[in-house]
Regions:
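Extracellular low-complexity, Gly/Ser/Thr-rich intrinsically disordered linkers
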Residues: 341-413, 460-465, 507-538
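C-terminal tail/sorting-segment detector
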Residues: 610, 625, 634-660
Length: 660
């Protein structure tokens, strides 16, 4: 319901407002037309091979320097094409606004990316985030139906002409916004890249790795097409030669994205005349048109693909379209998102400030929150009562959602990601404090995949400038120093950077041997740092553990070896982190399609919050963030909680602890 129109269109929309100067009923809207497939530029025709290649690349975390982020990490169908991790109020998804400080009104809900890393894989300290995962400064828009837009990103900086990211030669004269858009994240040191990464580095990585080596539950048609081939062979089928180039990567990903359009929502059945809306849905649709929403969220795409300032934040916070055009009329203006599948999304607007459609409708009902000369009159208090607001939400949530998108059904099926899987290293307990009473913390995020030449493990919160030792062993290293003199897997000495109590940080880059015999081996690690203020002169971090896995486990890598012969329908994992203060990520896997319920209970067995309620989900890995609140949005007290997953005739329960 973004707004901001030319004078002529604005006058037309104002005629549709609930209160009109001429005291006449608004004219009926023009009939909606069926949504056709998106346009395809002649220079990048769709072929099955190119689409399959693009699908593999889109979901391959190996495209990132850290091997932890794919395009699909931030763009998933089940959350309407946006990022399920991006939830307002979650610390791990919060970036500072223009004031540069966290915890203030201009904070942004973005997408977690990567730890700031140098070209050798060592971690650097980033402003605000330190050695934590950095967060983007805008909320990730949906990739579903993005192919209809002539310009992409919230500010439209991905334009229609696509230039080779290396040579600068024109590849597509028009229609190349998708190709342009997908060239940015793989070289962003916040989203996917190490500092100074060139596109040639990313292409070289892809040329050398096994396709989707980190993925599980690869859709059968895609896995059958890939077979045992490597990327150069896949590029040869898609493009006629085996060259893996940056431009070809972009062309393939864009080809796949052009197949990701949704046109089987209830609104499409209504357009086709095969179904009718309920009275409440009809009332919501009438309000959608009569209140002016349809002016910008126009046509069967429910977007005009234009840019408008609507008062989400002051124009000084984010220049929006102005940064591209230099036109003062574009200050703070953002691209109108399509409202298809909007009910599945976890955050709304370019800054992700709202969690629910109810909040979004309330925002429009009060006429936005800020004003500027370029804010159009159509953004004004609407005077909708609670029933009307609820009807509008029902229309948006129920009528515009394509069930294939919600259920991850083809063409919206996908592999599961390493970052969703239980194979991500787990931070455990223990540790001993050093100077300032601070216990050092380990950083273990990257995949312990056999053959991974750059498995980086970091430390922060120790004494700056101190000597530190990383120990990784088959048994958990002791929780207090000194560091063991030897280890079965790795023992590495590091001089920490930084100065002062709790300011020391460092990392080391290890190689996971390409040895199949290691698959299934659980290893445990801990850091030790010299510190005269620590007991015995040595502080120690919490322990961490991980299981070495092999490529393309198809879900088997997520099941303990002893259980692999035991049929099961689902697997529930401990929350990350546990214990937790602000939020915990609950991951689970389904080995068969099932109607799923995931419920949080307190220590007395009382239901606290239903996180998933009867949704039918396809086989794959899923994750849900619990923000430590009950069903009414109130923070729960510290203590023990249980969450239970039920589906396909089975169930599992896991314990977690909420801290103050």
């Amino acid at each position: 319901m973004t707004a901001g129109l030319s004078t002529r269109r604005l006058r037309f929309v104002l005629l549709l407002a609930p209160v009109v100067a001429l005291a006449q009923l608004p004219p009926p809207p023009p009939p909606l037309q069926p949504l056709p497939p998106p346009p395809v530029p002649p220079g990048n025709p769709l072929t099955p091979a190119k689409v399959n290649l693009g699908k593999a690349l889109f979901w391959d975390e190996q495209l990132s320097s850290s091997r932890t982020v794919a395009c699909g990490t931030c763009h998933r169908a089940e959350t309407g094409g946006s990022d399920p991790r991006s939830v307002s109020g979650l610390a791990d998804a919060t970036a500072p606004g223009p004031d540069g400080m966290l915890g203030t009104a201009d904070d942004i809900t973005g997408s977690p990316g990567v730890v700031l890393t140098d070209a050798g894989g060592a971690y650097d300290e980033a402003a605000v985030f330190g050695l934590g995962v950095q967060v983007t400064t805008r909320h990730a828009p949906s990739f579903i139906n993005a192919a209809y837009a002539p310009n992409l990103f919230w500010d439209g900086r991905a334009r229609t002409t696509f230039l080779d990211p290396v040579s600068g030669d024109t590849v597509l004269f028009a229609g190349g916004a998708l190709e342009n858009q997908c060239t940015a994240p793989p070289v962003s040191s916040v989203e996917m890249a190490h500092e100074g990464r060139a596109w040639t580095d990313a292409a070289a990585r892809i040329a050398a790795v096994q396709p989707l080596a980190l993925a599980a539950f690869i859709p059968a048609p895609l896995q059958g097409w890939i077979g045992t081939r490597r990327y150069p062979q896949l590029f040869a089928e898609a493009f006629g030669s085996s060259d893996v180039t940056p431009a070809r990567i972009a062309l393939a990903i864009a080809a796949y994205e052009r197949t990701q359009f949704s046109n089987e929502a209830k609104i499409d059945s209504m357009i086709a005349g095969t179904t009718t809306l309920t009275p409440q849905q009809q009332a919501g649709q009438g309000l959608f048109v009569g209140s002016g929403c349809a002016g910008c969220h126009a046509g069967s795409l429910f977007s005009d693909n234009a840019f408008h300032y609507i008062g989400v934040r002051p124009t000084a916070d984010d220049p929006g379209r102005f940064a591209v055009t230099g036109d003062p009329a574009d200050l703070g203006a953002m691209k109108t998102p399509s409202l298809r599948n909007v009910g599945l999304r976890s955050s709304y607007f370019h800054d992700g400030r709202f969690k629910t459609l109810e909040e979004v409708v309330a925002f429009y009902n009060r006429g936005g929150d800020f004003n500027a000369p370029n804010k159009p009159p159509v953004i004004r208090p609407l005077g909708l009562n609670p029933v009307q607001q609820a009807n509008l939400v029902v229309f948006l949530r129920e009528v515009l959602t394509d069930p294939r998108v919600a259920r991850r059904e083809a063409p919206f099926d996908r592999p599961s990601l390493y970052s969703e899987d239980v194979m991500v290293p787990t931070i455990e307990g223990g540790g001993s404090a050093g100077s300032g009473g601070i216990t050092p913390k380990p950083i273990a995020l990257e995949p312990p995949l056999t053959g991974n030449p750059a498995f980086t493990v970091g430390l922060h919160g120790a004494l700056g400038g101190a000597h530190a030792v990383l120990v990784i062993d088959a048994a958990e290293p002791p929780s207090t120093g000194p560091a063991p003199a030897s280890a079965s897997f790795a023992r590495v000495d590091v001089i920490l950077l930084g100065a002062g109590a709790g300011q020391g940080y460092g990392s080391t880059v290890l190689a996971i041997p390409n040895d199949p015999a290691l698959v299934g081996t659980r290893l445990h690690g801990r850091w030790y740092a010299d510190d005269p203020a620590a007991e015995g002169g040595v502080s120690s971090s919490q322990a961490f553990s991980f299981v070495v896995f092999g490529p393309r486990g198809d879900g088997l890598m997520s099941v303990p070896p002893a259980a692999r012969s035991t049929p099961r329908a689902l697997q529930l994992s401990p929350g990350r982190p546990t214990p937790f203060a602000a939020s915990t990520l609950i991951a689970y896997e389904l080995y068969t399609a099932a109607s799923v319920r995931l419920v949080v209970y307190d220590a007395q067995g009382r239901s606290v919050r239903t996180l998933v309620n009867g949704a039918t989900q396809m086989p794959g890995s899923y994750s849900v963030t619990w923000d430590g609140r009950d069903g009414g949005g109130r923070p729960v007290s510290a203590g023990v909680y249980w969450y239970r997953l039920e589906g396909a005739g089975g169930g599992q329960t896991v314990r977690t602890v909420k801290l103050d």
